[in-house]
Amino acid sequence: MGYVVSTFYRFVHLSNYYDIQPVLKEFCVQHSIKGTIILAEQGINATIAADKQSSLDEFFSFLNLDDRLKDIRYHKSFAMHNPFSKMKVKLRKELVCLGIEDFDNSVCGEYVSPQDWDDLISRSDVYTIDTRNTYEINFGKFKNAINPQTKCFRDFPEWAISWASNKVDQDPIIAMYCTGGIRCEKSTAFMKDLGFSKVYHLKGGILEYFKSTQNKNSLWEGDCFTFDDRIAVDNKLVPAHVKCVSCDVCVTPEEMKSITRGHVLCFNCKENVKI
């Protein structure tokens, strides 16, 4: 039996997000939907899975009852095993934690469609910046993309300020991307706040790029890390064959469930290697 996986987000003011939590949790449990939904005053961010497309269709129909969450665009992929073991609906101060107080993320960069992305990042005058964490980037990235070497998203502002110190006067063209689009959207707003004017981000992130282009120009190198038990997907959105970093043997679905922050070890090696 296969599973349908949906990833989505929306920046929107949800003043009553505390009240939304139990309602969403109950609906998902009743419809056998598992995954993680994050709610904040800034909006919603989620990856959920079900064994039937109809269950997810009902979920999005349920969201449509709230005008603020109506017609949310989502990315769909598939997995042979359910990538989640339970349903979580979390409350957060920030939807994605950049760690900047009183930061307005509404003035963000311009979207670039997956179809136009390759042309943009192939230009010699464009800086392509990966806004994900290093352990994610280790699985794969766009060719020649800058790796900020961050351990978590909260590290990004410090790197960006340092990187901008000798470049903001040049006002270069900046292209940013992440897994599903939410982090690069917020990152472009931060770069604009630093003084850059020509800032762009990949609409729908890497997942939408894979779906729309199948990496036809081979500018993506490797796989894409996912925050679930699949660990990573290839450019066809199929769960990747992830190998143990110690013995180079593909890990099993059960072993994948124990992987933390992209550190891939099979059960045998985990007993002998100190993380």
Swiss-Prot record:
Catalysed reaction equations from the record: uridine(34) in tRNA + AH2 + O2 = 5-hydroxyuridine(34) in tRNA + A + H2O
Tagged with keyword NAD: no
UniProt keywords, alphabetically: Oxidoreductase, tRNA processing
Residues of the active site: C178 (cysteine persulfide intermediate)
UniProt domain Rhodanese: residue ranges: 122-218
The keyword Oxidoreductase is annotated on this UniProt entry: yes
Broad class of enzyme this protein falls into: oxidoreductase
GO biological process annotation, one example: tRNA modification
Record InterPro entries: Rhodanese-like_dom, Rhodanese-like_dom_sf, TrhO, TRHO_N
GO MF annotation, one: oxidoreductase activity, acting on paired donors, with incorporation or reduction of molecular oxygen
Pfam families from the UniProt entry: Rhodanese, UPF0176_N
The protein's name: tRNA uridine(34) hydroxylase
Organism: Ehrlichia chaffeensis (strain ATCC CRL-10679 / Arkansas)
